[in-house]
């Protein structure tokens, strides 16, 4: 289920995935097969888990019917934009943008509940 908390963690998880992939490269380049006590296989398993999690969130966003809901979620949680910047880009007031965001979060959380 996708929650507001998972959306808020999206950018951090994406950065973490990049760091894990960098550690895998370093372990491969130095030939040791390990890095910071983790084997390449352990890093790859963690990276696959993070990548799957991020993909699930993006799929849920893409399944929303409203283009405004999809856009506001991407701008806020994937691109990390603030409400003012989103409002300017979407040509809405900040108040309307907050309403759209709140409704989009509600819709994505509801979609996750019906998937169970």
Regions picked out by a protein language model, each given a short descriptive name:
Residues 1-63, 84-85, 106-116:
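N-terminal interaction/assembly modules
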Residues 5, 81, 99:
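Short, well-structured alpha-helical interface segments that form or flank functional binding sites
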Residues 63-64, 91:
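Short, conserved sequence motifs enriched in acidic/basic residues, glycine, and aromatics
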Residues 64-81:
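Short amphipathic alpha helix immediately N-terminal
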Residues 79-95:
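Helix-turn-helix DNA-binding module
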Residues 91-111:
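DNA-recognition helix of helix-turn-helix
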């Amino acid at each position: 289920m996708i929650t507001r908390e998972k959306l808020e963690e999206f950018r951090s998880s994406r950065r973490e995935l990049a760091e894990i992939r960098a550690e895998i490269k370093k372990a491969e380049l130095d030939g040791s097969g390990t890095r910071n006590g983790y084997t390449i296989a352990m890093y790859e398993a963690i990276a696959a888990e993070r990548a799957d999690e991020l993909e699930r969130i993006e799929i849920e966003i893409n399944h929303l019917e409203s283009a405004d809901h999809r856009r506001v979620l991407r701008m806020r949680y994937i691109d990390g934009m603030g409400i003012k910047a989103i409002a300017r880009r979407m040509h809405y007031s900040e108040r309307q943008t907050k309403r759209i965001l709140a409704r989009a979060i509600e819709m994505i959380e509801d979609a996750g509940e019906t998937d169970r």
